[in-house]
């Protein structure tokens, strides 16, 4: 059995978790939810797309080296990755942002973490109450686009926040058949969990997202929600991700062009990780 926290590919998922006073959290939440979130969704996406396109410019490749020096302990961090498909080098910062592993991690566990980042929320589905979003009362099922009661109450809900420094491709946590793909339009409010002290998963209830269900060999559904945030030019699914298609554990499910969080409702519970710890792609779930 793999010990907790093994970094088989040394992905370095760690970043500073800010502890801010309540008044500042309230201010940031107001700016994110009320001011920015009050703008029409199309305007939010247009501004985010413009912001994202800036990082596609060739001059932004010169950001990569100082960015690595600032955020990563390994000065050769970039050497562990490949540029996106069809490119031979990192020609822009966006290319680095959507980098690919040269070698995917190897795990003997039947289920793994699908992404890299901070596990900012975790617990049984029935332990979560309701959230009020634009005068609507919403439950955990709202995130995944299903009706209340569709997800077994003993399932485990997790939310992993991906910092800008994190690897931004989402992988299958288990082998199985894709039994649902759903796109939910929405806002693009700020994702950083420390500004939503009592409800770090609030953005997942209202932001644009793709929901993907994977049914494993025991007939159990693993619910995934790939949630966008400000600056997201787009969320893309590989052409191989199709309804009724089969995926192997760690097959790629989606990638983000800047900013994201990944929620999951699973029949299994994490063995080695708990709220406010860091997880890595391929680490034992």
Language-model region placement:
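Contiguous, well-folded functional domains in the mature portion of proteins
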Residues: 1-285
